[in-house]
Amino acid sequence: MRKIRWVVVGTLLFAGQAFALEYQWNDLNLTLTNHASIGAAMRMQDRDLDLIAKTNVPGQQNLCQVDDCISFSHDPAPNMRLVNAKGAYFGINGDNGDLNYDRYALVSATSLLDSDLKIGYGDFLLRVRGIGYFDPVNFRREERHNNTLYQGSRSQRNAHELGIFARNGRLMDAYLQYNFSVADRNAVLSVGQQSVRWGESTLIAINSLNEINPPNSAFLHMPGAQINQIFQPVPLGLLSFDIADGLSADLLYQFGWKPAQPDAAGSFFSTSDIAGGGQYAMISLGAFPEDPYQRATPAKPSLASPTSILGLISSTSFSTRILPEKYGAPSNGGQYGAKIGYNANWLNGGTELGFYYLNYHSRLPYASLYAADDSCARHSANAAIALVDCHGFNGSLTAQLQQNLGIVGLAPLEPAPIDTVKVFLDYPENIHMFGLSFNTNIGSWAVSGEYSYRPNLPLQVQISDVVFAGLQPALPAQDQDLTNLAAPLGITLPIPSVLTLPGAGSAFPGFLTKYRGISEVQAHQLIRGYQRFKVGQIDITGIKAFSSNPFGADQILLILEAGATQIYNLPPLDQLQIEAGVAYDTHHGPGADGTGTPDGKPDTRHINPTQQTTGFATRFSWGLRSIALMEYNDVIFGWSFKPQIIL
């Protein structure tokens, strides 16, 4: 939703009329229907620099290069340089799509073919449907990188990203259906990959009753794609039957899980460089530039920054490889549900009612991780003992330190293994959904609505707090005074009189560990990035067709939808924060600039540059969505023109 503020896309779409081949012989019926479309979209506005990473803003490539915008001598100036700079703190993991397309650039030009084969024989029906698409604009486009300290200015997109939205073929429906009757009641059994639409929500898909078929966001943003192409068919068995006049039931069991498909990382509408084929994540709140190959190391002392001592003792980078996408996938089994449908002829001249239950595994990914390795100084009593425990540390001075200690040849150990945290996309299992819906007519409007309730819906904990929890083992348990470390070793360092290496509690004070009662995070401990809550959601939809209109269209279909979500028993912000995905994300803990500290004074031991106080999920939220579908038939050579206006 946040990109609505800055994206205006011009779209041109020509949808070819469907053409079909039909064949019939006795009880055998064969139909092949093909639908082709061509569409293009163009970016119409410049970038908003507040939405891209601080180190990706033009002129700020070296913003923190000299000192990592961190001070070990309690000097607030490096952090304030970061705070005052243009750009988004957390944008480093979500701005590739913004950087790849300039104003007036085509962001997509998709040709799409949807082929649907149906073979009927008596009471049996076999359906196989597939979609092929090609986008020459994105298939040939390279990734663009503003910051080139640790990578080139251009790079090739990986095959997985290209397959999501640039060139691929996808099997959609593939199922066998059998129509029969029991006690003079009609019944249908279908088995295979298919779509089952529950509920009445049209434009608000997330957390609606229409949960069975996960959406494909890449298809949603393809100019020319149809609504029936957005939701992915899944493998399941479905039994639909009449119980009595006006009363019916659906029973289903899903035997194959599929996730929602996010926009490909780096595509125009993407909001994450991790989900959708991303291969690495930056552990950064604005200070560290993109480093896909883990080439960067902490800053070292210089004339410009004599206090940057981390590089003397550590070789950690500030990026990490993402575990394979399938790592956090749930099991295929254990997903089932039922629907009861009732046609209430006595209500408003005819109203369809539905009652639902579904047990399913999440289609949406959550950011979870395994905690970092233990710092070799995690339990060292002081810096001198840490020097021995770490075999002379693991930085640029290691060889000299080992020689002075008389331990040459021992493998150096890492005091700050920040880049050993392991991030993965997590899909929680066994979410329960209960719901009801209605569908009726009021005047010339088709009006429908639904309510869904989930007693154990996972919600994403603020990602920076999840990361802070995972980084607890990567620093000493207590602050380490490094001031007197150099003299006993005979080393002259360009350092001031006070130097402090912050402990984990000072650098990464978090909320998630306290909320879950974790006294000490262990190395490699699994940190689930979600917390389950009771959540209810209501949607109301109105649809009206206009054949007579001032735009000369053959028809305009107007869809209006309102929705509201309630999170029950959401804890206050001083206990836990739920991610809302704003560009200015930092962390709700105290900032190095003094925000959130008891006395308001800067405390440079904190990695968090400034406290975030807004932009979290709230107990109640609501919104409106609308779409006008305009149709101009047979514009030229049998092609139709179908512009869409989405608000």
Segments predicted by a language model, with ranges:
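N-terminal signal peptide c-region/cleavage motif recognized by signal peptidases
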Residues: A15-Q17
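Short loop/turn motifs that connect adjacent beta-strands in outer-membrane beta-barrel proteins
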Residues: A20-L32, M44-R47, V107, L117-L126, ...
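Outer membrane beta-barrel
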Residues: G120-G278, G623-R625, K642-Q644
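Transmembrane beta-strands of outer-membrane beta-barrel pores
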Residues: I38-M44, G132-P136, Q193-R197, Y253-P259, ...
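Detector for outer-membrane/organellar transmembrane beta-barrel domains
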Residues: L106-S108, L358, S448, Y515-L647
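Residues that define the transmembrane beta-barrel architecture of outer-membrane proteins
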Residues: L28, V107-S111, R167-M172, F231-P235, ...
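Residues on the lipid-exposed face of transmembrane beta-strands in outer-membrane beta-barrel proteins
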Residues: N34, L113-I119, V128, D173-Y178, ...
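Solvent-exposed loop segments that connect transmembrane elements
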Residues: D50-D95, F139-L162, N210-M222, D263, ...
